[in-house]
Amino acid sequence: MRRVKRNTDLTTNLGSVTLPNPIMTASGTAGYGNELSEYMDLQEIGAIVVKSLHAEKWEGNLAPRLHPTPSGMLNSVGLQGPGVKTWADEKLPALRNSKARIVASIWGSTVQEFTEAAFHLRDTPPEVVAIEINASCPNLEDRRKLFSHSIQAITEVVEAVNVVKKPLWAKLSPNTPELPDIAEAAHKAGAEAVVIANTVLGMAIDIESRKPILGAKRGGLSGPAIRPIAVRAVFDTYEAHPELPIIGVGGINCAEDALEFILAGATGLQIGTAIFRDPRICKKVIEGLSKWCERHEVKKISDLIGGAHD
């Protein structure tokens, strides 16, 4: 496939990980492998972040699991998956063949479960450039408080996952006023970057049955509705810790949305819900960023990071 030569340098550095551009898929929106390969050359995307994987096979939540909203989507899939070892054996080879840069996302409900999931990834090939810790999971050892809502818990889980000896990213929840402090704690514990932010807590009720629509009752809201929340979360975290690489996610639908996150302080970007509407959206946003930078005579996209703080 012919590559388009760009006049703007989109190179993105996230700790020790270097990507050709800042755009990635968000975990849970592009499957476990090369599902998007029929729509684009996966090498053109900064990285593919696979759906979060548990140490063991996981069945997920009861249906219904998805519900559209006026400006987004509620989901309560419950992190259904084949288990990290099965993924590495059965799904990873095809994704490697696509020459994509891969980020494996893992989750657990105890520190030990995170450790076990990471252990299965210790011998993954170099195409797996980073491990994303989905810390927006209930901690069964702390009254179901989310790992990403506790400085102590995020510290423990990041330190435990370091057994994998690959760059770590911590995906955090926006549903806490302590987000900048928790991001700093994750960084000090060994995360080279933080992903901000996961879904916002939400719910929908069927007025005829008078019951919650989702099978698990509660869910996470994603899509354009949460973009202002995520942009502020990135802004606040960058303001407190400008040295910390941030990957912004939440409601990105176009290059202009992506630029908001970059100016707020994001170095990398993930696109999620928009992929369901347009599986080519990542490529379109990359092209849009390049064109915007050329129009504004921006030579390196990294020069824009945190620009709204100047």
Language model features with spans:
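Glycine-rich phosphate-binding active-site loops on the catalytic face of alpha/beta enzymes
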Residues: 50-55, 130-131, 135-137, 193-203, ...
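Glycine/Thr-rich beta-alpha phosphate-binding loop at enzyme active sites
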Residues: 73, 137-152, 182-244
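Glycine-rich beta-to-alpha transition loops that act as phosphate-gripper elements at the mouths
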Residues: 30, 105-108, 172-178, 244-256
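N-terminal capping/small domains of soluble enzymes
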Residues: 1-102, 107
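Catalytic cores of alpha/beta
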Residues: 34-39, 114-124, 176-189, 239-242, ...
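Short beta-strand/loop segments at the ligand-binding rim of alpha/beta enzyme cores
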Residues: 18-24, 98-103, 163-174, 239-249
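Alpha/beta catalytic cores of nucleotide-metabolism and tRNA/nucleoside-modifying enzymes
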Residues: 1-6, 221-245, 253-310
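Conserved, mostly hydrophobic/aromatic
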Residues: 25, 48, 87, 104, ...
